[in-house]
Amino acid sequence: MTQTIGIHKILCSGPADLAAAAQLIESGALHPDEIVAVMGKTEGNGCVNDFTRDFATQAWCALLAPHLGVSAQAVHRRVAFVMSGGTEGVLSPHFTVFTRSNSDAPPSSTPRLSVGIAFTRDFLPEEMGRMAQVSETAAAVTAAMHDAGIGNHSDVHFVQIKCPLLTAAKIAAATARGAAPVTHDTYESMGASRAASALGVAVALGEIDAATLADAAIGRDWSDRQSVV
């Protein structure tokens, strides 16, 4: 079985503007059942209180649900949505849609683009930025490699992760249970979550032995790093 990957760049005037995407679907140029991932840039501030990312994701789920015959919640579990807030300067709001289809065509004799996706479970607030997140991310990267049909670590050149962050409500919930989050600063949690995610990639690709890592080193020991973007 051979993968065929399609990439569509779709401009938008706002987080919920999917008119161009709807037109592509209606014309037959974009098949909803082949969509595996959507990456987007919205006009939000990119900070903790940027809700344009969730708004855009909800809009996509609502658009695709009737075409796929499933609920909007099911779409969220089927398609990898990665939204990034902030379009300052010359960057325009847009979505990049990745599609994947399989055929019986013979495989290429040279390396080609392959795409795989995977999801972690939801993390408890006190797990974010710690080894639990590293381990779960590593498992997800391994699953994504399998989904993409990639068997060699050296063939992985890009891993896109949408990692969670702490909010005031999550911090309060953890504290009420007697658990201690990695930080009480929501902005600092963004860095801790990214660090744990990056180390998870490194573990999955065999660049770091998970046994050498510990909670205290995440985001602090700069000798531990991953080389894949």
List each language-model region with its residue ranges.
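Terminal domain-initiation and capping elements
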Residues: 1-229
